[in-house]
């Protein structure tokens, strides 16, 4: 489907291609030659004729003014020619607006061609690879630096030998070797010219001069002068020796690309044939060089461009307003650096012309050629220029054209991908506990400024006596009290977007309904802070106003905070109560035995509340109420008993929940488990569950005649609800009340309503279907909810518009379109925000009771354990004993250090366990309440308060060498801090702990920056991955099982978690052959539990890794969208979400920390952020010693210690693996492993290809050589999951799969066959498959290639889109490659479209489904047949013609600056729409709340 809001018949750019500019191109762009280095006249400030700012070339400085006779024309005269004076007739200046100075170009006619700097400097010199010069007769290549010497006129090159044996073609003649080469050449020429008397003498004289000069001191010190000898050689023979750009031009014009291409391909084939099985590094290097040459030659052949276009004959001059000259106060001027660089070129070019005219010596001209070449180089790319960039007087390097493109501040990232936004403000945030979840408090003055145009519109419509924009604006600017009612009206149904930097994931920008508040700070709902990662210690947030209708609808439907309950990374609610709210709810649900008036009966809820308010009972008292008094459907459905008991607090909590939500009875201990640990101590662990009316009602109800008090005394005391339980309840609320009926269906019910129809509303609603196609009559909760909402809103509208008084002017006889629209709008808003309404009630309860509880903490609340001091004393004795052992030589120092650290870690652990018991036995203690409720603090914090602080970090730098050589790195101080904060630290202990504290802060800061960069790289990798179709039809699944840590044999991620929310690839049967789930079915949580319960350990699912959709994914391979808990919609930008989900928690991954200070090596090193980068960037040398992997399927024959030649042990193991080769013969492969590495195999073990033989990280490229891509994908997936899960961060597999799919999406061509590919090229897997499919169908030979793994750093650079690649990194290199290949960008990804200012091809601008979440229509469009008494211009009727007419009218009624100066105030308001009148006060810099 296409979007209702999209503009029709707008001319769209379909693709953008980049090629080399030919000489003709430059002349066709140009409007004249810039021949003078002047800019503007220092007296008149007018641009100089033929200078860099000439008005005739670049356009007028004033709108529609002739640059010669200064006549002012009207807009209607645009593009005509002025003929007022004779000069005008001669020059024929065009009448143009001043904006043309941003687009009109000029050129400088260079007096000598110049080689384009990028093409011999970037990417190891395109020109060098293209020419691939070799010295004739020998195999010596001409290097890149040799070529540069020619370009800068330092050396000469033999272009033609003319039959002279002493000259070899393509030989570079260096100034030091010139004497011998020229002497040989002259002697040969002398032989040929024996008969030519005059010539013979001239040549002989020259030869003698040369020998004499070469032998002299000057000749030996400075080398000889080439030029006169060149002239003689060229005069008397066919030889040709050249230098500089002319020599390069000659070479480029005479290269035969077809012939070169064929020769290179033959050479590559020869290398491949000779090295079928293994290739030496020198041969591989040679082949690589040939691949690169072939790529460039093929680029020129395919694009049909001429190699000589790499030279510049006419240098384009960019438009004048893009390199402005700005007047500063005090008559000074500031100019763009580019003007200075152009001036140097013009000055040198003009001087060269003078040398030509005065017939100067060659040497002088040659020097000028070189200076001209260097000047053009500086203009193109000053920062890369060697020996150093051109600098200004104060020594700063000039910014050249390239510098304006690259980097964060370059054109791409600063102006094209990120722009400053008008209608925005920012301020500090404070908490707004009274707000609804979809509301935000906006300061009044900020709102007045943000919504100024709308407010002015309202005031002019409705306020008497104000009929000019100027007057209305004055009211708004002065914040006149008259405006506030209008501000309120404007804010209705106009959401604003809130953003908190850093924007790590999509929930960092959400929409809210603004509410006006006094003060200067923005008020934020407390529950959305988690999503923004905000707190109220001075954070700031930015506000943006969506302007168009489409933007407003998107904000309301897709971005409203109350609809973004689930976090996209794991599908768990991100709107979880915390801190105060948790403490309040914990306090509210405390249950105690033997309270005053326990077991008392109250006939109603209100009576119970009265007793509570009069302090007869407290919140923890267990009391009895009649079941009927609770009006809870969820209880009435489950029991016939008349009475129910719970605590007062829980009755209050459940009363706040909806009537059909389960009654929550609290947390019950189901069993106590006791076990003994390794120290022989008894450990008690509790198993608990939340009791609800769904399953456990029988425990909590009484029958007639029961003794309430006695029965309650016997009952167990339930535990209060902590953070985890409340999170479960929130999840439950979400699942129960999230909308399941779409707006289209609700509108059909409303369509049938009129005054009489309300009676059968129940029947109409029960016919509705949910998203699974089931009728609503099966889902009572939603049926009742919809009926209630429609009824309530219907009656409100009746009361508002249909007055009881028949004569009333407000009395509408019939329902019209606006009434239906309003009803749908209100019902849909309440229905889709119902979850947030319930959560708001929970929030209010939490705050209320945390206030009422009056919980405070003091020093006396810190309870200590009596055994702490004894444990520390015992540990001190044991560490002393270790020192003794070391002195006696039983231990090495490293072993002693490691054991000491282990001892202190154990002591701290035992103290923590002891204190945990203390906490569990004192649950009334306010400090422990905070701890056990999960409101704040952890057991480890409390251990530091009451037990001991423990071991501290040291400032040892951990080096890669330590990891590789398995040194014990002493990154922990071995003397711990033995005091707790309660005791107070000694001076030494305080000093010792400062380092660790600072390290923590610096690590976090560094980590945040690295994590941000990682997210950026991942987004670049996956930005184009969007859900494009329903089903790609892939029959190739992905087999998943539990992800286990093979070392500890613990499950990292269970099968159930991995398959839930995915589609099956094949039918799944249990052991008895009974079908559990069909093929291509969604695995729901229930099905997933059933599969695991039936003992199935492997499941084949549809996966991102085997999806056949090009440039995206299909719904079946992706599965469930975690943020909505539904099957994903077409148009969802899953690539970006995947990147955000992996990058956002990146900050929480620890840096490389050594946990127990244990032995460096093994698992310690491979944790954390560094390892994640290693995997995602596919490092060839990971940290530590890489694992040795088996290359074959075979058996470990023997493992022995390797000995050197002298028979001594060399410190390595030799593992012999026996396997069968392709011909079935037995072979043995030897693997060498360091003896310090732990082995993972033993003698006699069967091994498979890719299996680890020793501990350590696997090098991905090595793994890919020995196994298929599936195994590599599995390995990366497992490793990344391991990193996150060990830190307690859950991320869905599918996100990591998307990144892996992109990393393995390129194929390196080895044999091109009959395809259009060439050897060594990297092509996209989809392109490769398509091309091969076509070749096979035509009976031709297909191409053969191998999959290559590319890290996240390189993947974006290999993108099909050159715009996306150039805006990422290495801009110049990408543009060079794209231009020689004449690459075309089809604008398929998100980034390319942002760059050229189009909507991204995702979301509401994609090909979405009819009833998908992106099909956003105006509410009124759901009622096409309803009567509308207010005819307006409908959206479809606003065509481009209408808009054009409007603009033409505005432009014609525009006046000149001079007339403008003489206007009086009364005339001013007519100008408000004119494009000449630029209202300064709304400019970006003056905007009071503008971004940054």
Curated annotation (Swiss-Prot):
Co-factor requirement: Mg(2+); Zn(2+)
CDD domains, A to Z: RNAP_beta'_C
InterPro entries from the UniProt entry: DNA-dir_RpoC_beta_prime (IPR045867), DNA-dir_RpoC_beta_prime_bact (IPR012754), RNA_pol_asu (IPR000722), RNA_pol_N (IPR006592), RNA_pol_Rpb1_1 (IPR007080), RNA_pol_Rpb1_3 (IPR007066), RNA_pol_Rpb1_3_sf (IPR042102), RNA_pol_Rpb1_4 (IPR007083)
Cross-referenced Pfam families: RNA_pol_Rpb1_1, RNA_pol_Rpb1_2, RNA_pol_Rpb1_3, RNA_pol_Rpb1_4, RNA_pol_Rpb1_5
A GO cellular-component term linked to this record: DNA-directed RNA polymerase complex
Binding residues annotated for Zn(2+), in chain numbering: 1032, 1107, 1114, 1117
Enzyme class: transferase
Any single biological process term in GO: DNA-templated transcription
Cofactor comment: Binds 1 Mg(2+) ion per subunit. Binds 1 Zn(2+) ion per subunit; 2 are expected compared to other organisms.
Keywords: DNA-directed RNA polymerase, Magnesium, Metal-binding, Nucleotidyltransferase, Transcription, Transferase, Zinc
Annotated region (Disordered), positions in chain: 1473-1492
GO molecular function, one term: magnesium ion binding
Family label: Belongs to the RNA polymerase beta' chain family.
HAMAP family, alphabetized: RNApol_bact_RpoC (MF_01322)
General function of this protein: DNA-dependent RNA polymerase catalyzes the transcription of DNA into RNA using the four ribonucleoside triphosphates as substrates.
Subunit (UniProt): The RNAP catalytic core consists of 2 alpha, 1 beta, 1 beta' and 1 omega subunit. When a sigma factor is associated with the core the holoenzyme is formed, which can initiate transcription.
Name of the protein in question: DNA-directed RNA polymerase subunit beta'
Organism this protein belongs to: Mycoplasmopsis synoviae (strain 53)
